């Protein structure tokens, strides 16, 4: 929720997407979110960022969703921006998208950062990939996305945080 809120406050157009057959998605701790849209390949166009939320079992579902895996690989192949927080950087590692990059993740998922270098930092920016350690780092994670997209001045605005 803070990621979507802060990005919208910064003026970044975002769409939350459900990979299930329903817009209503329940998170790891029982928080229900209504996604803006369902994942339909024809609607996934003009992407600036692919952002993966963490948590379980959500991260597992993201990693198992074939169309998302294909989209992540395709987006990465053209140096598209990708961000993942908490357990979700493991999806990037499993796809080989962290090769040669620094990354961080929720404690216990370090072994899934294949090809990457685990740094234990709160947030890691490595080329086109941003990773965040966990839910407590959501604000810093989102600010890194905003800085990379719009510059530091935009991220420093009081209305963003």
Task: Specify the residue positions occupied by each region the protein language model found.
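Active-site-adjacent pocket-lining segments in enzyme domains
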Residues: 5-19, 35-161
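Short active-site-proximal "capping" loops at secondary-structure junctions
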Residues: 19-25
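A cross-family phosphate/adenosyl-ligand binding-site feature
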Residues: 26-36
């Amino acid at each position: 929720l803070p990621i979507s809120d802060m990005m919208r406050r910064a003026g970044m157009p975002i769409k939350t997407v459900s990979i299930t057959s329903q817009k209503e998605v329940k998170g790891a701790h029982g928080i229900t979110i209504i996604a803006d849209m369902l994942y339909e390949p024809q609607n996934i166009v003009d992407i600036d960022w692919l952002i993966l939320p963490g948590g379980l079992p959500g991260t597992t579902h993201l990693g198992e969703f074939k169309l998302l895996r294909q989209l992540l690989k395709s987006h990465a192949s053209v140096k598209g921006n990708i961000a993942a927080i908490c357990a979700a950087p493991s999806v990037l590692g499993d796809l080989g998208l962290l090769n040669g990059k620094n990354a961080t993740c929720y404690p216990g998922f370090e072994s899934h950062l294949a090809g990457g270098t685990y740094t234990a930092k709160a947030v890691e920016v490595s080329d086109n990939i941003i990773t965040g350690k966990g839910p407590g780092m959501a604000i810093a994670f989102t600010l890194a996305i905003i800085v990379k997209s719009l510059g530091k001045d935009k991220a420093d605005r009081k209305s963003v945080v």
